[in-house]
């Protein structure tokens, strides 16, 4: 595996190449950390604009993935193969500045991806 960190202005966090005996696979990956585990909810949020940015920054020979890293588990979704008919889309009320108490609320188109759509998950140790 060869891992490349993306520049700060990039839409994703890293790219990596996985090499086997007969081929190479290329991946464009976004990492999201969450303070709560899947026992508290059955979906993970992803802003629609972020989803579009990730797909637009993914090269033709790459697959786009998003990793949700939670306190006790990791959930991985293949955004290149995500069935949008099974994803809930809502105008979610989000603070314009995430960690500010005085921030105004903005209605933001957000996808809520069911955890059951993950292509892989594991328990963190």
Model-assigned labels for residue ranges:
Residues 66:
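Anionic-ligand binding patches
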Residues 1-20:
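A short acidic/basic microdomain associated with nuclease active sites
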């Amino acid at each position: 595996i060869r891992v490349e960190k993306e520049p700060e202005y990039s839409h994703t966090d890293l790219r990596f190449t996985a090499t086997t005996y007969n081929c190479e696979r290329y991946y464009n990956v976004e990492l999201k950390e969450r303070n709560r585990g899947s026992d508290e909810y059955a979906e993970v949020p992803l802003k629609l604009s972020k989803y579009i940015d990730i797909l637009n920054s993914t090269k033709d020979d790459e697959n786009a993935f998003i990793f949700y890293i939670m306190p006790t588990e990791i959930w991985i979704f293949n955004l290149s193969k995500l069935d949008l008919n099974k994803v809930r889309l809502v105008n979610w009320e989000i603070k314009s500045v995430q960690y500010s108490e005085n921030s105004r609320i903005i209605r933001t188109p957000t996808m809520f991806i069911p955890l059951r759509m993950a292509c892989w998950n594991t328990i963190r140790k």
